[in-house]
């Protein structure tokens, strides 16, 4: 295998992307196309929302994976980290031919190395925070490109904002320590707790990964961190003793300084809050106090880049930021509103960890106190479910009705028989009075057609494929009108 590299100038370079339909890969394709690269790709035949993005870009996508997809002799191959040559003939052929290859995290690292780069990290909250920053970049006319891990609302289904090339801002993922390929000048750290149990053997293991990520900051690099999160406080304490040269900027309700948060409550489907260092109120149009914390982290980074580009922060800059937050509608699969029909509000959220589930449901309960909340949850990965079984069972307290399914398996793990969806169902029944189990997602359709009524909020939760249930039910009730 020949480790490839991406030069700062990719204009005219032929880049083939294996697994191009993934959210991150398609976003990277858009970024590379905008910089003049000749991009092609390959993937499975299944249709995803990223197909529309790739078609709009004019990127040829070949299906299925095949050695023939390399016939155009690409200069570089970038592949999703989900694929390895032992299981993907196309990637194995690229290795055999000696074509320079690199993974998606490695490609992101090369891009970050050539620019003033900022990484957004955290077990929870990094996607929404990055999406908020993307909209701020547009409104503030910052000379920056932003790569988000999901399609941003109001951004033409796209996961990227291309506003310039001085700054590069990206969502960076902790899974398998992928973010250690990134070269940040600034980091926003939203949350840290044990997750990805198929890779991280313990909480201490994932804590160490985040410590090493912070340690990649250069001398006098900036760390914006959510001091309300216990895991963040612990990793920052470790970093502070070994890296006293860094600039530490806390944000949250516990924070001192400019980004100390006071939350005032929900008003007209917006949460009002204020920051210690700024006059007046801010509003965020997403449910949950965690949305306020995400907004504050985004504000802190955006204002630091405003100072770097413009030399000062003006009233106009703050007005623009207030506007972004008040109008921000989230991103795909993050408290995403699918629509309302017959008085039933349909939503979808990617929350697949007990902490995320609890925060999401509590936020929805506060935002929509008059609605009954009906949740369909599909747990993702056997290892995560086994490790957090009790926590999952206790995470639905703010739901009125709960539907569970068989666990959505990860391609990267083998089921060992230790836990399944019925185990989660039996334990959840002890904690909640209305819990139902349907092994397959679509088996729940008749029950939900009869159960849902005017005034309900139906939300699909999880990283599985149960999100399709919302669309099926929405269309059913639409036809019934």
From Swiss-Prot:
The broad enzyme category this protein falls into is ligase
Give its E.C. classification number.
6.3.2.8
Subcellular location per the Swiss-Prot or TrEMBL entry: Cytoplasm
Which Pfam families does the protein's record reference? Answer: Mur_ligase, Mur_ligase_C, Mur_ligase_M
Q: Which UniProt keywords apply?
A: ATP-binding, Cell cycle, Cell division, Cell shape, Cell wall biogenesis/degradation, Cytoplasm, Ligase, Nucleotide-binding, Peptidoglycan synthesis
- Annotated Gene Ontology cellular component terms: cytoplasm
| SUPFAM superfamilies linked to this entry | MurCD N-terminal domain (SSF51984), MurD-like peptide ligases, catalytic domain (SSF53623), MurD-like peptide ligases, peptide-binding domain (SSF53244)
Per UniProt, ATP binds at 122-128
Question: Catalysed reaction(s)?
Answer: UDP-N-acetyl-alpha-D-muramate + L-alanine + ATP = UDP-N-acetyl-alpha-D-muramoyl-L-alanine + ADP + phosphate + H(+)
What Gene3D superfamilies does the database record attribute to this sequence? Mur ligase, C-terminal domain, Mur-like, catalytic domain, NAD(P)-binding Rossmann-like Domain
Q: What pathway does the UniProt record associate with this protein?
A: Cell wall biogenesis; peptidoglycan biosynthesis
- Record's keyword annotation contains GTP-binding: no
Q: Name the InterPro entries on file.
A: Mur-like_cat_sf, Mur_ligase_C, Mur_ligase_C_dom_sf, Mur_ligase_cen, Mur_ligase_N, MurCDEF_pg_biosynth, UDP-N-AcMur_Ala_ligase_MurC
GO molecular-function terms, A-Z: ATP binding; UDP-N-acetylmuramate-L-alanine ligase activity
GO terms, biological process: cell division; cell wall organization; peptidoglycan biosynthetic process; regulation of cell shape
Q: Does Acetylation show up as a keyword for this record?
A: no
Q: Which NCBIfam families match?
A: murC (TIGR01082)
Task: Quote the function comment for this protein.
Answer: Cell wall formation.
Task: State the family named in the UniProt similarity comment for this chain.
Answer: Belongs to the MurCDEF family.
Its name, as the record gives it, is UDP-N-acetylmuramate--L-alanine ligase
Organism per entry: Treponema pallidum (strain Nichols)
Q: Which gene encodes it?
A: murC
């Amino acid at each position: 295998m020949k480790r490839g590299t991406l030069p700062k100038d990719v204009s005219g370079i032929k880049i083939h992307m294996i697994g191009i339909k993934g959210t991150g890969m398609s976003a990277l394709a858009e970024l590379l196309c905008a910089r003049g690269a000749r991009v092609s790709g390959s993937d499975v035949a299944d249709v995803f929302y990223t197909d529309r993005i790739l078609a709009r870009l004019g990127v040829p996508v070949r299906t299925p994976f095949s050695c023939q997809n390399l016939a155009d002799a690409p200069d570089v191959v970038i592949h999703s980290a989900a694929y390895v040559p032992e299981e993907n003939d196309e990637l194995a052929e690229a290795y055999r031919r000696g074509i320079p290859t690199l993974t998606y995290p490695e490609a992101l690292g090369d891009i970050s190395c050539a620019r003033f780069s900022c990484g957004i990290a955290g077990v929870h909250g990094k996607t929404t925070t990055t999406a908020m920053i993307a909209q701020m970049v547009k409104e503030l006319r910052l000379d920056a490109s932003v790569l988000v891990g999901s399609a941003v609302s109001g951004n033409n289904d796209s996961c990227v904002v291309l506003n310039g090339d001085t700054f590069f801002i990206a969502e960076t993922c902790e899974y398998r320590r992928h973010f250690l390929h990134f070269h940040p000048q600034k980091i926003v750290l939203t949350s840290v707790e044990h997750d990805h149990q198929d890779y991280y053997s313990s909480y201490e293991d994932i804590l160490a990964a985040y410590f090493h990520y912070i340690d990649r900051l250069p001398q006098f690099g900036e760390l914006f961190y959510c001091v309300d999160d216990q895991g963040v406080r612990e990793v920052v304490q470790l970093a502070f003793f070994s890296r006293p040269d860094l600039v530490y900027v806390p944000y949250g309700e516990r924070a001192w300084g400019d980004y100390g948060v006071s939350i005032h409550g929900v008003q007209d489907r917006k949460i009002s809050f204020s920051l210690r260092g700024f006059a007046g109120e801010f509003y965020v149009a997403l449910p949950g106090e965690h949305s306020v914390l995400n907004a504050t982290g985004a504000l802190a980074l955006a204002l630091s880049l405003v100072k770097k580009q413009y030399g000062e922060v003006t009233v106009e800059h703050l007005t623009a930021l207030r506007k972004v937050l008040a109008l921000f509608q989230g991103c795909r699969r993050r408290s995403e509103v699918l629509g309302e029909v017959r008085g039933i509000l349909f939503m979808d959220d990617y929350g697949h960890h007990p902490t995320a589930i609890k925060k999401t449901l509590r936020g929805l309960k506060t935002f929509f106190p008059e609605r009954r909340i009906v949740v369909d949850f599909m747990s993702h990965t056997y290892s995560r479910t086994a490790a957090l079984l009790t926590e999952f069972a206790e995470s639905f307290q703010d739901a009125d009705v709960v539907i569970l399914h068989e666990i959505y398996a990860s391609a990267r793990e083998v089921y060992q028989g230790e836990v399944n969806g019925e185990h989660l169902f039996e334990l959840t029944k002890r904690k909640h009075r209305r819990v139902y189990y349907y092994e397959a997602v679509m088996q729940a359709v008749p029950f939900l057609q009869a159960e849902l009524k005017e005034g309900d909020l139906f939300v699909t939760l999880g990283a599985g494929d149960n999100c399709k249930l919302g669309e099926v039910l929405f269309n059913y009730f639409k036809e019934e009108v």
